[in-house]
Swiss-Prot record:
Described function: Forms part of the ribosomal stalk which helps the ribosome interact with GTP-bound translation factors. Is thus essential for accurate translation.
InterPro entries cross-referenced by the UniProt entry: Ribosomal_bL12, Ribosomal_bL12_C, Ribosomal_bL12_C/ClpS-like, Ribosomal_bL12_oligo, Ribosomal_bL12_oligo_N_sf
Keyword Acetylation: no
Recorded coiled-coil stretches: none
Protein name, UniProt field: Large ribosomal subunit protein bL12
GO molecular function: mRNA binding; structural constituent of ribosome
Record family assignment: Belongs to the bacterial ribosomal protein bL12 family.
Subunit structure: Homodimer. Part of the ribosomal stalk of the 50S ribosomal subunit. Forms a multimeric L10(L12)X complex, where L10 forms an elongated spine to which 2 to 4 L12 dimers bind in a sequential fashion. Binds GTP-bound translation factors.
NCBIfam families hit by this protein: L12
Organism: Pseudomonas syringae pv. tomato (strain ATCC BAA-871 / DC3000)
UniProt KW Ribosomal protein keyword: yes
Biological processes annotated in GO: translation
Keyword annotations of the record: Ribonucleoprotein, Ribosomal protein
Length: 121
């Protein structure tokens, strides 16, 4: 006769805590295993290794050379004069969204050269 999983679960449910602990010890000895929960170490390490691949170029402030910054925003985004001015006037805000690291670094350098304060996120 075979014992079903439900029968085993019902039998364990009727046991006291001490009996369950003794049962676990018996399982560990019989099968050479431990009932300890596994650590999440390797998964956490893998998360640390992941590198950010997409960046947002944030214009923090235009600085004193606002016209140059507007020109730089137009050059980087392809926006018209009115739209680029709105982006610069609306600082802090995103100039470019989800761009590669190289493009983000170039955009940051261009905007900083024009006189803006920029941050990559």
């Amino acid at each position: 006769m075979s014992i079903s999983q439900d029968d085993i679960l019902n039998a364990v449910a009727e046991m006291s805590v001490i009996q369950v602990v003794e049962l676990i010890k018996a399982f560990e000895e019989k099968f050479g295993v431990t009932a300890a929960a596994g650590s999440a170490g390797p998964a956490a390490a893998a998360a640390v290794v992941e590198e950010q691949t997409e960046f947002n170029v944030m214009l923090l402030e235009a600085g004193e050379k606002k016209v140059n910054v507007i020109k730089a925003v137009r050059e980087l985004t392809g926006l018209g004069l009115k739209e680029a001015k709105a982006v610069v006037d609306g600082a802090p805000g995103i100039v470019l969204e989800a761009v590669a690291k190289d493009a983000a670094d170039k955009a940051k350098a261009t905007l900083e050269e024009a006189g803006a304060k920029v941050e990559l996120k």
